[in-house]
Amino acid sequence: MSKYDSHLKCSFCGKSQEQVRKLIAGPGVYICDECVELCNEILDEELMENAAGMGMGRSPEKNPPKAPPEKINFEDIPKPREIKHYLDEHVIGQDEAKKVLSVAVYNHYKRLSLMEDDDADPVADGIELHKSNILLIGPTGCGKTLLAQTLAKILDVPFAVADATTLTEAGYVGEDVENILLRLLQVADLDVAEAQRGIIYIDEIDKIARKSENPSITRDVSGEGVQQALLKMLEGTVANVPPQGGRKHPYQDCIQIDTRNILFICGGAFVGLDKVIERRVGKKSMGFVRPGEEGSAKEQRTAELLQHLSPEDLVKYGMIPEFIGRIPVIASLSPLDEEALVEILTQPKNALVKQYKKLLKMDSVQLEFEPTAIRAIAQEAYRRKTGARALRGIVEELMLDVMYELPSRKDVNRCTITPEMVEKRSTAELLLHPSSLPKPESA
């Protein structure tokens, strides 16, 4: 031991090496075991305070218990026809998927009302109503996510939308599957009882398909591993949800949520699934189609093949049998044709054309789309093969110069979008105010 060792002391409390049990050395600093223990206590207190702020508090003064959620009256439950009618006002086509969703939501309400009825025993006759989770399959831009978002607006139960692409198996970089429940909890204002009667829509579920049909010796942490992690949640379990999101750790208090009564709706494009069905059914495309009809003929054939979808096709695609078994209801959405894109532009309550008319009305300008221009926009969107999502991009390109110029022009009261403008051959036609027109010269 050197002559300097006896003078070593803790850089925080100042105690010498002889006064403490252990002195830990760092680059030019020292900390004793007592200070380390004190730091741990401070961190634990801070974690508890943060958890209390997120609704986990144990102090009745700071966090009074929330009132139980209002019971669902069976007579007030929206009927399937009413739910579908509301969806029809906002989403074009996809009648079969709308019926599936309407019935599923209605039955979900009925299960909740039966369990919340104090005078009724849900299993008095030995019959217990189980939930039926749903899988929506359809190409990109056909309305899967929009259907879910529209449903959320009319429901009296919490509705959350989650993305499966960010999920990974526990212990790896990414989000735990419990973060899906955290989104529902946040929508329910951190009311656990309210969240436990909610609905969750998991988008891009096809992205967690395992990379190979055969089991691999390497871990598939964002595919099969996520499916395995979701199994109990879909079926019904008591999950531990970290109130601040992220990964769970031993020093963090978790909120327990029972998922037995949470309805799960999953959606995905499942690109290439038609090829899997085709190999099983044995249907091959034969014959000829007229020039220009190749795309529509292929989409029609894909839609027909999806009508023959069976669970074994999804297993071949990469979904594990246990996962498919927990989603008994499967609905296919059709690709959007040109006619449907025209209707999407004009008919829904929140149609794109109506949105831009409202925008220009705020500048005291009346916006008009010629019918042939709307048809040209739909044709261009159909060529881009991204469904209804392409419509906003096309209209935004068309309106950029108009929306840039009009706020500075007080002499314009009408703007007309023509098919030539859609085809990039001309600019929008602007109609001037009568007071702004040049006066005719006197003879």
Swiss-Prot record:
Record-given protein name: ATP-dependent Clp protease ATP-binding subunit ClpX
Keywords: ATP-binding, Chaperone, Metal-binding, Nucleotide-binding, Zinc
Top-level taxon in the UniProt lineage: Bacteria
Residue ranges constituting the ClpX-type ZB domain according to the UniProt record: 1-51
Residues engaged in binding Zn(2+): 10, 13, 32, 35
Function noted in UniProt: ATP-dependent specificity component of the Clp protease. It directs the protease to specific substrates. Can perform chaperone functions in the absence of ClpP.
Keyword Transmembrane: no
One GO location term (cellular component): HslUV protease complex
A Gene Ontology BP annotation from the UniProt entry: cell division
CDD domains assigned to the protein according to its UniProt record, in alphabetical order: RecA-like_ClpX
Residues in the signal sequence: none
Native organism taxonomy: Bacteria, Bacillati, Cyanobacteriota, Cyanophyceae, Oscillatoriophycideae
Family the UniProt entry places it in: Belongs to the ClpX chaperone family.
GO terms assigned for molecular function: ATP binding; ATP hydrolysis activity; ATP-dependent protein folding chaperone; protein dimerization activity; unfolded protein binding; zinc ion binding
Subunit structure: Component of the ClpX-ClpP complex. Forms a hexameric ring that, in the presence of ATP, binds to fourteen ClpP subunits assembled into a disk-like structure with a central cavity, resembling the structure of eukaryotic proteasomes.
List of residues binding ATP: 139-146
Keyword Nucleotide-binding belongs to the record: yes
